[in-house]
Amino acid sequence: MNSFLSGVKVLQVGDGIAAAAATSLLANLGAEVSKLCGGFSPSRVGPMIAVGAASVPLVDVVLDRGKRILRSPSDTSALIDAHDIVIVDHDAAIDPPQARNAVVVSVSPFGLTGPRSVERGGELIAQATGGMLATIEGSDGTPVPAPGYVALKAAGAVTALAALHGLDRSEHATGRLGDQFTTPLDGARS
């Protein structure tokens, strides 16, 4: 069966929710997705599921479904150039790669440049800066965060759209690959 992104190769670099949600969406559209792990497991909230002798956050099981998990290769640039789209998470602790043959989308809390670019983010920060935190109040009027990584998953959807836009622009409008985009989690454009 031919699907929308059949033949498109996507590489996820890092373990953040937004990047994982973006690549999960692209995988559901038919892309072949590989995930390059960072060597550490970020802490997650929510239900855990037993996988062998270990417990794994259910959100990771859901978002990593259908992905090929890779360990650090000896030649990262060759790995990057073997993909059409590379999505780099802000917690990956690497600079956004330069790619000759791929669209690179970086997910960061406040963009890659500017006065807040070095600040850490996360679900609560994304909900607060995006205005979502103001939509639910407790009985005493204080803000209540939405459960389930809602803001980071929404940022993942925007990241996937940025990747598809870059792919379309690179292949059809300019005839070249190698465009770079940034998806700040606070909703601002950088």
Model-derived features with residue positions:
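N-terminal helix-loop segment corresponding to the beta1-alpha1 unit
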Residues: 1-179, 185-187
